[in-house]
């Protein structure tokens, strides 16, 4: 069984026991989170497509850890002015393991 969930402004195709990295969630490591915005749920070619979400379908996942992504450097240089600016950013991520998919 698979599902397509929407979280953090992105869509992910998930199945049971999948481990994926998503945008940061406000949950402790080891906590169980529940995703209710399910776009598609089904087995193989037999899938239920939501409009926009499948009513009553949920996906449960366990929070494995919180981490940060690679550093992205924003570098600005102004020509002929001996002026430059370098700024770094690291995005926060949450690693989750899908435990259960409940279809309506």
Curated annotation (Swiss-Prot):
Biological process terms in GO annotation: translation
SUPFAM superfamilies in UniProt: L21p-like
UniProt KW keywords: Ribonucleoprotein, Ribosomal protein, RNA-binding, rRNA-binding
CC terms in the record's Gene Ontology section: cytoplasm; ribonucleoprotein complex; ribosome
GO molecular function: rRNA binding; structural constituent of ribosome
One Pfam family from the record: Ribosomal_L21p
InterPro entries according to UniProt: bL21-like (IPR028909), bL21-like_sf (IPR036164), Ribosomal_bL21 (IPR001787)
Quaternary structure annotation from Swiss-Prot or TrEMBL: Part of the 50S ribosomal subunit. Contacts protein L20.
Record family assignment: Belongs to the bacterial ribosomal protein bL21 family.
The protein's role, per its UniProt record: This protein binds to 23S rRNA in the presence of protein L20.
HAMAP family reported in the protein's UniProt record: Ribosomal_bL21
Name of the protein: Large ribosomal subunit protein bL21
Gene: rplU
């Amino acid at each position: 069984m698979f599902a397509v969930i929407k979280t953090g402004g992105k869509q992910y195709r998930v199945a049971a026991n999948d481990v994926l990295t998503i945008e940061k969630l406000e949950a402790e490591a080891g906590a169980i989170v529940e995703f209710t915005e399910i776009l598609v749920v089904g087995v193989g070619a037999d899938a239920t497509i939501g409009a926009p979400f499948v009513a009553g379908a949920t996906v449960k996942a366990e929070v494995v850890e919180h981490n940060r992504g690679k550093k992205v450097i924003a570098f600005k240089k102004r020509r002929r002015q001996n002026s430059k600016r370098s700024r770094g950013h690291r995005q926060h991520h949450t690693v989750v393991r899908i435990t259960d998919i409940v279809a309506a």
